[in-house]
């Protein structure tokens, strides 16, 4: 059980960290393109669009690097979960409003759809696992002790 | 790992992409040596291109190109599904040969009346409305020039070389860095970007 959890822990860190690094790196290549995607959501005031396009990729890169380094992993995972939840909420609201916008997540021309929302939910799972890992371990230990 | 990460990030920051032809015969506004250059690949019949021109580029032309802070270059990229866009591009290029004033007037008219001529194919009427009778007659002669089709083909080839897959797509070059943008961008966002570079 402990070995399986350890493997899962590393897999989640590597996958999630890699995704955040790639996503941030991609957005850094053209902050204006990312700004165009944010503008497409029609949710953010114009004055916030460029600052978001400038700084959000760095936040993603920092989260990716911290996830890979393992430093304060629980808090970093909570941060990653919060960011992913915000993305999911924004994508869902934009989709429900019927706006034909680009996701701007990992590539351009990727329109917001149930598929892009489901993809973000899938990415959220390892982040939630890492954030709740200690509790899961404690629960597992308690269960093992009780059944002994 | 972190050194590799930093190297990767550093590679994301400098310019990437193919530098375009620096000649400015297709410069719709601004000086060729302006600190910011925008190259737009556009289709006259595409509604998003109309939106980009009417809501963003016209304001860029007014506020930045007139002060030579930004140079806007338009490349023709007529899409196959739009039956009249190549004809519109030919008229636009013919007007370009008369001068920037006439060219801008034709581009303005074509985008402003897009819904009308796109529907009935009355491109010529939209062009006639934008020019004096004399200039219109000159455009009717110039449009026969086979080099106009050559320019369109060159623009399309340039777009394909730069991986333009849809319209509008534009490239902004500033501070030695080129950024590709697919789709529209509100003027206020672009203005904030410009004002960091040229006040």
Task: Give, region by region, the residue ranges found by the protein language model.
Chain A
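Short, low-complexity, charge-dense intrinsically disordered segments
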Residues: 141-148
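Membrane-interfacial helix-loop segments of redox and metal-homeostasis proteins
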Residues: 1-138
């Amino acid at each position: 059980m402990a070995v399986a959890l350890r493997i899962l822990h590393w897999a989640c860190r590597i996958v999630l960290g890699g995704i955040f690094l790639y996503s941030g790196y991609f957005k850094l290549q053209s902050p204006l393109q990312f700004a165009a995607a944010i503008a497409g959501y029609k949710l953010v005031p114009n004055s916030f669009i460029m600052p978001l396009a400038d700084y959000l990729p760095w936040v993603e890169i920092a989260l990716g690097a911290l996830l890979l380094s393992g430093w304060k992993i629980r808090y970093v995972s909570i941060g990653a979960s919060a960011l992913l939840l915000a993305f999911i909420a924004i994508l869902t609201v934009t989709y429900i409003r019927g706006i034909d916008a680009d996701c701007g997540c990992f590539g351009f021309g990727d329109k917001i759809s149930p598929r892009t929302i489901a993809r973000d939910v899938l990415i959220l799972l390892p982040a939630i696992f890492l954030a709740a890992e200690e509790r899961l371990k404690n629960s597992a230990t308690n269960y093992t002790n009780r059944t002994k | 790992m972190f050194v590799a990460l930093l190297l990767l990030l550093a590679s994301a920051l400098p310019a990437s992409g193919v530098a375009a032809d620096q000649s400015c015969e297709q410069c719709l506004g601004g000086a060729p040596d302006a600190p910011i250059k925008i190259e737009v690949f556009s289709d006259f019949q595409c509604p998003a291109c109309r939106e980009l021109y009417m809501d963003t580029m016209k304001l860029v032309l007014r506020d930045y190109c007139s002060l030579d802070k930004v140079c806007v270059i338009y490349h023709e990229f007529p899409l196959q599904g739009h039956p009249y866009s190549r004809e519109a591009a030919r008229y636009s290029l013919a007007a370009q040969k008369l001068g920037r004033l006439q060219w801008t007037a034709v581009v303005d008219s074509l985008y402003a009346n897009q819904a009308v001529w796109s529907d009935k194919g009355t491109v010529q009427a939209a062009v006639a409305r934008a020019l004096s009778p004399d200039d219109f007659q000159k455009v009717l002669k110039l449009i026969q020039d086979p080099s106009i089709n050559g320019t369109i083909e060159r623009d399309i080839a340039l777009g394909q070389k730069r991986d333009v897959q849809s319209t509008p797509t534009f490239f902004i070059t500033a501070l030695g860095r080129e950024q590709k943008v697919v789709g529209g961008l509100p003027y206020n966002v672009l203005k904030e970007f410009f004002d960091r570079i040229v006040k």
